[in-house]
Amino acid sequence: MVDYTQRPKSRFLRVKCNDCENEQIIFGSASRKITCVVCGRTLAEPTGGKSTITTHILEVLE
């Protein structure tokens, strides 16, 4: 049986900051610049669709 239900293509991501090792959950299609809450480093930048992730992705959350 084929599943025809529509699912969103956007996901939440667990990322780790390259500077302070802080783990944070961010939205993969964010419309604003996302910074680390501890050190202020840019983690993701918007591109009109999916965000450009500038740090290490630990896990893709469903």
Curated annotation (Swiss-Prot):
Description of how the protein assembles with itself and partners: Part of the 30S ribosomal subunit.
Keyword annotations from UniProtKB, A to Z: Metal-binding, Ribonucleoprotein, Ribosomal protein, Zinc, Zinc-finger
Zinc finger (C4-type): 17-39
Cellular component terms per the entry's GO annotation: cytosolic small ribosomal subunit
Entry-linked InterPro entries: Ribosomal_eS27, Ribosomal_eS27_Zn-bd_dom_sf, Ribosomal_zn-bd
Cofactor: record remark: Binds 1 zinc ion per subunit.
Name of the molecule in the record: Small ribosomal subunit protein eS27
Annotated disulfide bonds: none
Presence of the UniProt keyword Ribonucleoprotein in the record: yes
Gene3D superfamilies: Zn-binding ribosomal proteins
Calcium listed as a keyword: no
BP terms from Gene Ontology: ribosomal small subunit assembly; translation
Organism of provenance: Methanosarcina acetivorans (strain ATCC 35395 / DSM 2834 / JCM 12185 / C2A)
NCBIfam families the UniProt entry points to: PRK00415.1
Gene Ontology terms, MF aspect: RNA binding; structural constituent of ribosome; zinc ion binding
Top-level taxonomic group: Archaea
Family under the similarity heading: Belongs to the eukaryotic ribosomal protein eS27 family.
Cofactor field: Zn(2+)
Binding-site list for Zn(2+): 17, 20, 36, 39
